Amino acid sequence: MDTIFALASAPGKSGVAVLRISGSRAFHAGRVLAGGLPDAQRTSLRKLRDSDGSVIDEALVLAFESPNSFTGEDCVEFQTHGSPAIIAALMNELSALPGLRLAQPGEFTRRALENNRMDLAQVEGLADLIEAETEAQRKQALRTFSGELGQKVELWRKDLVRAMALLEVTIDFADEEVPEDVYPEVQELLGRVSQNLAAESAGTHAAERIRHGFEVAILGAPNVGKSSLLNRLAGREAAITSSIAGTTRDVVEVRLDLDGLPVTVLDTAGLRETQDEIEQIGISRAMARAESADLRIILIEDGRLPSGLGVADDDILVQAKSDILPSSSEFAISSVTGRGIDRLVKAVSHRLSLRAASAGTATHVRHRLAISSAVESLDLAKTKISEGFPVELVIEDLRQALVDLESLIGRVGVEQVLDEIFANFCLGK
């Protein structure tokens, strides 16, 4: 297998740059450039030289001996000054060495997966950690990256393997008396796994929302102050405001960090009866996005709801323009003076935080589908046991459930998703 190298830090000028080398010839490459290497898991300050002996830079050099490295292979890292010229010179020297090539996106992590340094869920957690923009995203990604889902899968797997082994006993003793009735223990094991999977499945929606962001739609009649509220929340002129009704015709989105939660606030077209075909399209889009939103803020000006809009239990009704229309409403705001905005934001954050609290460790659609498939197989197995089906058919259902669970951590049937996952990594990962 080729030895690979890449810049592990962000490209461009910086105080420090990190260049990573991994593979069987990593130590040789390190010695060629640095004149020698420190002991494994140690660091030393060395001059890096080109093939003519000229100094390229003075850098911290680290060596990691297989399997105690990120990839599980021999690895060398150079921590250099973050000059593009220095990195280009080092890349040129490494490219000229036999058996070395530039890494593909995510190739270091792919090797870590292949060498069992991490499972597939941890790989996804690492990708999410790199992309995390808010505190909630960081915490969730770190849980996945730390292997929490893999630990759960291993517990579920042990219970299923135990249940299958017990059932196999009844086949082995088909013509003899089975030493003991195994079905009570089998049913207990399957019940426990089913209960755990149901709990994990219940938290997938919240976990996915944390990854992608919650959506909060602002609804109301034209000129009620929806765009003004969006601009106040964004702290900038994200949407055009005008006294002309129907100014907003498409959905305007603003990404916010509300108490660590990723939230996309949607400014929508004013809801009213209109003959304007373009405005009608905008209103239809507004209603569609509002239906799929996690939370709706409904602005009212005269105490009346916009035509055709029903109110859900979790909607937040807000009296707008409180600077000119005094109100005793729980949520009365003025986007001009800022009155009531903090109270509204806290209410939104609180309601979304309650939903986020139910998030599990299964954070991707792939995880949810695999768990759902495993639950379906377990339900079939339990039904067949209760109806007296042949044991072989029950075992086959349990085996399918096991395959579904093992796909969560990349043991089986995930080759088709690897390229998509690793394509989103940078070269140095």
Curated annotation (Swiss-Prot):
K(+) binds at residues 223, 242, 244, 247. One of its GO terms (biological process) is tRNA wobble uridine modification. Its EC number is 3.6.-.-. GTP binds at residues 223-228, 242-248, 267-270. Its main location: cytoplasm. Keywords: Cytoplasm, GTP-binding, Hydrolase, Magnesium, Metal-binding, Nucleotide-binding, Potassium, tRNA processing. Disulfide bonds: none annotated. It is found in: Cytoplasm. Binds 1 potassium ion per subunit. InterPro entries: G_TrmE, GTP-bd, GTP-bd_TrmE_N, GTPase_MnmE, MnmE_dom2, MnmE_helical, P-loop_NTPase, Small_GTP-bd. It is an enzyme of class 3 (hydrolase). Mg(2+) binds at residues 227, 248. Its cofactor is K(+). GO terms for cellular component: cytoplasm. (6S)-5-formyl-5,6,7,8-tetrahydrofolate binds at residues 20, 77, 117, 429. Pfam families: MMR_HSR1 (PF01926), MnmE_helical (PF12631), TrmE_N (PF10396). Exhibits a very high intrinsic GTPase hydrolysis rate. Involved in the addition of a carboxymethylaminomethyl (cmnm) group at the wobble position (U34) of certain tRNAs, forming tRNA-cmnm(5)s(2)U34. Homodimer. Heterotetramer of two MnmE and two MnmG subunits. Belongs to the TRAFAC class TrmE-Era-EngA-EngB-Septin-like GTPase superfamily. TrmE GTPase family. This is tRNA modification GTPase MnmE. It comes from Dinoroseobacter shibae (strain DSM 16493 / NCIMB 14021 / DFL 12).
